[in-house]
Amino acid sequence: RDSHAGGHGTVDLYASIAESVNTYYYRLAMDMGIAKFDAYMRRYGFGQPTGIDLIGEIPGILPSPEWKRKRFNQPWYLGETVIAGIGQGYWVVTPLQLAQGTASLANGGRRIPLRLVQATRTGLNQAWQPMPAPPSTSIGATAAQLQDIRTGMEAAMHTRKGTGWAIALGSPYRIAGKTGTVQKISRRGSVSMDPRSLPLHLRHQALFIGYAPAENPKIAVVVVVEHGGYGASTAGPIARKMLDAYLLPKSEAVVPEKPND
Protein backbone atom coordinates (compact mmCIF):
# COMPACT_ATOMS: atom_id res chain seq x y z
CA ARG A 1 0.00 0.00 0.00
CA ASP A 2 0.96 3.66 -0.23
CA SER A 3 1.53 6.12 2.58
CA HIS A 4 -0.80 8.57 0.82
CA ALA A 5 -4.15 8.46 2.62
CA GLY A 6 -6.89 7.29 0.27
CA GLY A 7 -4.47 6.22 -2.43
CA HIS A 8 -3.55 7.97 -5.68
CA GLY A 9 -6.31 6.68 -7.92
CA THR A 10 -5.45 5.61 -11.47
CA VAL A 11 -1.95 6.72 -12.45
CA ASP A 12 0.32 6.35 -15.46
CA LEU A 13 4.10 5.93 -15.49
CA TYR A 14 4.79 9.65 -15.24
CA ALA A 15 2.49 10.18 -12.27
CA SER A 16 3.83 7.06 -10.55
CA ILE A 17 7.32 8.55 -10.59
CA ALA A 18 6.26 12.10 -9.77
CA GLU A 19 3.97 11.13 -6.89
CA SER A 20 6.03 8.12 -5.70
CA VAL A 21 3.23 5.58 -6.07
CA ASN A 22 4.37 2.29 -4.53
CA THR A 23 1.45 0.26 -5.82
CA TYR A 24 2.38 0.96 -9.45
CA TYR A 25 5.73 -0.74 -8.90
CA TYR A 26 4.26 -3.62 -6.94
CA ARG A 27 2.20 -4.42 -10.02
CA LEU A 28 5.10 -3.83 -12.39
CA ALA A 29 7.40 -6.17 -10.44
CA MET A 30 4.76 -8.91 -10.45
CA ASP A 31 4.15 -8.49 -14.19
CA MET A 32 7.88 -8.64 -14.96
CA GLY A 33 8.76 -11.48 -12.62
CA ILE A 34 11.89 -11.53 -10.50
CA ALA A 35 14.14 -13.01 -13.22
CA LYS A 36 13.51 -10.21 -15.72
CA PHE A 37 13.50 -7.61 -12.96
CA ASP A 38 16.90 -8.84 -11.76
CA ALA A 39 18.34 -8.81 -15.29
CA TYR A 40 17.25 -5.24 -15.96
CA MET A 41 18.56 -3.88 -12.67
CA ARG A 42 21.90 -5.58 -13.26
CA ARG A 43 22.28 -3.54 -16.46
CA TYR A 44 22.32 -0.41 -14.31
CA GLY A 45 25.14 -1.79 -12.17
CA PHE A 46 23.29 -3.07 -9.13
CA GLY A 47 24.64 -6.21 -7.47
CA GLN A 48 28.19 -5.54 -8.70
CA PRO A 49 31.07 -3.11 -8.03
CA THR A 50 30.97 0.23 -9.83
CA GLY A 51 34.63 -0.02 -10.82
CA ILE A 52 35.73 2.97 -8.75
CA ASP A 53 39.45 3.15 -7.94
CA LEU A 54 39.04 2.53 -4.21
CA ILE A 55 39.65 -0.58 -2.15
CA GLY A 56 36.91 -2.20 -0.11
CA GLU A 57 33.93 -1.53 -2.36
CA ILE A 58 31.08 -3.99 -1.79
CA PRO A 59 28.81 -5.24 -4.58
CA GLY A 60 25.61 -4.93 -2.56
CA ILE A 61 22.80 -7.45 -2.99
CA LEU A 62 20.53 -7.79 -6.00
CA PRO A 63 18.17 -10.44 -4.63
CA SER A 64 16.96 -13.38 -6.69
CA PRO A 65 15.63 -16.90 -6.06
CA GLU A 66 19.14 -18.28 -6.63
CA TRP A 67 20.67 -15.83 -4.19
CA LYS A 68 18.08 -16.64 -1.49
CA ARG A 69 18.54 -20.37 -1.95
CA LYS A 70 22.31 -20.05 -1.50
CA ARG A 71 22.03 -17.65 1.42
CA PHE A 72 19.12 -19.11 3.40
CA ASN A 73 18.28 -22.41 1.70
CA GLN A 74 14.71 -21.15 1.32
CA PRO A 75 12.36 -20.72 -1.64
CA TRP A 76 11.45 -17.38 -3.16
CA TYR A 77 7.96 -15.98 -2.52
CA LEU A 78 5.86 -13.69 -4.67
CA GLY A 79 5.68 -11.13 -1.87
CA GLU A 80 9.45 -10.74 -2.10
CA THR A 81 9.12 -9.86 -5.77
CA VAL A 82 6.50 -7.28 -4.86
CA ILE A 83 8.65 -5.40 -2.35
CA ALA A 84 11.70 -5.66 -4.63
CA GLY A 85 9.70 -3.42 -6.97
CA ILE A 86 10.20 -0.49 -4.59
CA GLY A 87 13.77 -1.35 -3.65
CA GLN A 88 13.03 -2.92 -0.28
CA GLY A 89 13.32 -6.42 1.15
CA TYR A 90 16.72 -8.02 0.64
CA TRP A 91 18.03 -5.22 -1.58
CA VAL A 92 21.38 -3.71 -0.57
CA VAL A 93 22.74 -0.87 -2.69
CA THR A 94 25.49 1.68 -2.18
CA PRO A 95 25.29 5.42 -2.84
CA LEU A 96 27.87 4.93 -5.59
CA GLN A 97 25.65 2.39 -7.34
CA LEU A 98 22.73 4.80 -7.13
CA ALA A 99 24.92 7.57 -8.56
CA GLN A 100 26.10 5.37 -11.42
CA GLY A 101 22.55 4.31 -12.26
CA THR A 102 21.29 7.90 -12.12
CA ALA A 103 24.10 9.06 -14.39
CA SER A 104 23.18 6.31 -16.86
CA LEU A 105 19.65 7.71 -17.06
CA ALA A 106 20.99 11.22 -17.55
CA ASN A 107 23.67 10.50 -20.16
CA GLY A 108 21.52 8.61 -22.64
CA GLY A 109 21.92 5.06 -21.40
CA ARG A 110 25.66 4.43 -20.94
CA ARG A 111 26.98 2.87 -17.74
CA ILE A 112 30.42 4.33 -17.08
CA PRO A 113 32.76 2.84 -14.45
CA LEU A 114 33.38 5.40 -11.70
CA ARG A 115 36.78 6.79 -10.83
CA LEU A 116 38.39 9.42 -8.62
CA VAL A 117 41.83 9.80 -10.22
CA GLN A 118 41.86 11.76 -13.48
CA ALA A 119 45.61 12.02 -13.99
CA THR A 120 48.91 10.98 -12.41
CA ARG A 121 52.55 12.10 -12.55
CA THR A 122 55.77 10.53 -11.37
CA GLY A 123 57.28 13.68 -9.83
CA LEU A 124 56.68 17.35 -9.10
CA ASN A 125 58.48 18.40 -12.27
CA GLN A 126 56.85 15.78 -14.45
CA ALA A 127 53.87 16.30 -16.72
CA TRP A 128 50.47 15.03 -15.72
CA GLN A 129 49.45 11.89 -17.57
CA PRO A 130 45.68 11.55 -18.01
CA MET A 131 44.22 8.26 -16.93
CA PRO A 132 42.58 6.45 -19.84
CA ALA A 133 38.82 6.71 -19.83
CA PRO A 134 37.23 3.42 -18.77
CA PRO A 135 35.02 1.82 -21.42
CA SER A 136 31.29 2.32 -21.01
CA THR A 137 28.55 -0.20 -21.68
CA SER A 138 24.99 0.27 -22.88
CA ILE A 139 22.19 -0.40 -20.41
CA GLY A 140 20.07 -1.56 -23.35
CA ALA A 141 17.31 1.04 -23.09
CA THR A 142 15.90 2.94 -26.06
CA ALA A 143 15.92 6.73 -26.22
CA ALA A 144 12.12 6.73 -25.86
CA GLN A 145 12.25 4.53 -22.75
CA LEU A 146 14.85 6.74 -21.11
CA GLN A 147 12.88 9.86 -21.97
CA ASP A 148 9.79 8.43 -20.28
CA ILE A 149 11.74 8.01 -17.03
CA ARG A 150 13.36 11.42 -17.36
CA THR A 151 9.97 13.05 -17.95
CA GLY A 152 8.61 11.42 -14.79
CA MET A 153 11.62 12.53 -12.75
CA GLU A 154 11.25 16.09 -14.00
CA ALA A 155 7.55 16.00 -13.11
CA ALA A 156 8.50 14.90 -9.59
CA MET A 157 10.33 18.20 -9.17
CA HIS A 158 8.26 20.68 -11.16
CA THR A 159 4.58 19.73 -10.81
CA ARG A 160 2.40 20.52 -7.81
CA LYS A 161 1.79 16.86 -6.96
CA GLY A 162 5.44 15.92 -7.33
CA THR A 163 7.17 14.78 -4.15
CA GLY A 164 10.11 17.06 -4.95
CA TRP A 165 8.04 20.17 -5.71
CA ALA A 166 9.23 22.14 -2.68
CA ILE A 167 12.85 21.13 -3.28
CA ALA A 168 12.91 22.71 -6.75
CA LEU A 169 11.04 25.91 -5.89
CA GLY A 170 12.94 28.99 -7.03
CA SER A 171 15.50 27.02 -9.02
CA PRO A 172 16.67 28.83 -12.18
CA TYR A 173 17.41 25.46 -13.79
CA ARG A 174 15.24 22.37 -14.28
CA ILE A 175 15.91 19.35 -12.06
CA ALA A 176 15.07 15.70 -12.68
CA GLY A 177 14.85 13.80 -9.42
CA LYS A 178 13.24 11.12 -7.31
CA THR A 179 12.64 11.12 -3.59
CA GLY A 180 12.80 7.90 -1.62
CA THR A 181 11.91 6.78 1.89
CA VAL A 182 12.90 3.35 3.18
CA GLN A 183 10.93 2.12 6.16
CA LYS A 184 12.79 0.22 8.85
CA ILE A 185 9.62 -1.30 10.32
CA SER A 186 6.22 -2.33 8.98
CA ARG A 187 3.12 -0.26 9.55
CA ARG A 188 0.87 -1.87 12.17
CA GLY A 189 -2.68 -0.67 12.72
CA SER A 190 -2.88 2.88 13.99
CA VAL A 191 0.73 3.08 15.15
CA SER A 192 2.26 6.38 14.03
CA MET A 193 4.92 6.11 11.32
CA ASP A 194 6.01 9.71 11.83
CA PRO A 195 9.80 9.33 12.17
CA ARG A 196 9.85 12.01 14.85
CA SER A 197 7.86 9.69 17.14
CA LEU A 198 10.09 6.65 16.57
CA PRO A 199 13.37 5.70 18.25
CA LEU A 200 16.36 6.77 16.14
CA HIS A 201 17.29 3.24 15.05
CA LEU A 202 13.75 2.64 13.72
CA ARG A 203 13.40 5.87 11.75
CA HIS A 204 13.13 5.82 7.98
CA GLN A 205 16.14 6.13 5.69
CA ALA A 206 15.86 9.26 3.53
CA LEU A 207 17.07 9.16 -0.08
CA PHE A 208 17.20 11.41 -3.11
CA ILE A 209 18.62 10.86 -6.59
CA GLY A 210 18.69 13.45 -9.33
CA TYR A 211 20.55 15.29 -12.05
CA ALA A 212 20.57 18.77 -13.57
CA PRO A 213 20.03 20.68 -15.71
CA ALA A 214 17.28 18.28 -16.77
CA GLU A 215 17.53 19.16 -20.47
CA ASN A 216 21.35 19.08 -20.60
CA PRO A 217 22.67 17.17 -17.58
CA LYS A 218 26.03 18.16 -16.14
CA ILE A 219 25.89 16.54 -12.69
CA ALA A 220 24.17 13.61 -11.00
CA VAL A 221 23.73 13.59 -7.22
CA VAL A 222 22.69 11.06 -4.60
CA VAL A 223 21.94 11.79 -0.96
CA VAL A 224 21.31 9.10 1.65
CA VAL A 225 20.53 10.16 5.23
CA GLU A 226 20.40 7.18 7.55
CA HIS A 227 17.44 7.40 9.94
CA GLY A 228 16.80 10.83 8.44
CA GLY A 229 13.05 10.58 7.93
CA TYR A 230 11.63 11.36 4.51
CA GLY A 231 13.50 11.82 1.26
CA ALA A 232 11.53 14.93 0.34
CA SER A 233 12.12 16.78 3.61
CA THR A 234 15.62 15.61 4.55
CA ALA A 235 17.66 14.26 1.64
CA GLY A 236 16.18 16.39 -1.14
CA PRO A 237 17.08 19.82 0.30
CA ILE A 238 20.67 18.64 0.77
CA ALA A 239 20.78 17.58 -2.88
CA ARG A 240 19.42 20.97 -3.95
CA LYS A 241 22.27 22.71 -2.13
CA MET A 242 24.76 20.43 -3.88
CA LEU A 243 23.25 21.18 -7.29
CA ASP A 244 23.23 24.93 -6.62
CA ALA A 245 26.85 24.83 -5.47
CA TYR A 246 27.90 23.10 -8.68
CA LEU A 247 25.72 24.94 -11.21
CA LEU A 248 25.26 28.47 -9.84
CA PRO A 249 27.41 31.37 -8.71
CA LYS A 250 27.27 31.55 -4.93
CA SER A 251 25.13 34.69 -4.99
CA GLU A 252 22.34 32.94 -6.92
CA ALA A 253 21.89 29.88 -4.70
CA VAL A 254 18.39 29.55 -3.24
CA VAL A 255 17.59 27.74 0.01
CA PRO A 256 14.70 25.36 -0.75
CA GLU A 257 11.59 25.48 1.37
CA LYS A 258 11.00 22.63 3.79
CA PRO A 259 7.90 20.69 2.70
CA ASN A 260 5.25 19.47 5.07
CA ASP A 261 5.82 15.81 6.01
Range-by-range predicted roles:
Residues 225-228:
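Ligand-site clamp/hinge motif
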Residues 25-27, 230-233:
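Extracytoplasmic/secreted cell-surface and envelope-processing proteins
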Residues 1-222:
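Beta-lactam-recognizing serine transpeptidase/beta-lactamase-like catalytic domain environment
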Residues 98, 231-236, 240-243:
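Short, charged, low-complexity patches
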Residues 126-138, 238-261:
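Short, gly/Ser/Thr-rich active-site loops of penicillin-recognizing serine hydrolases
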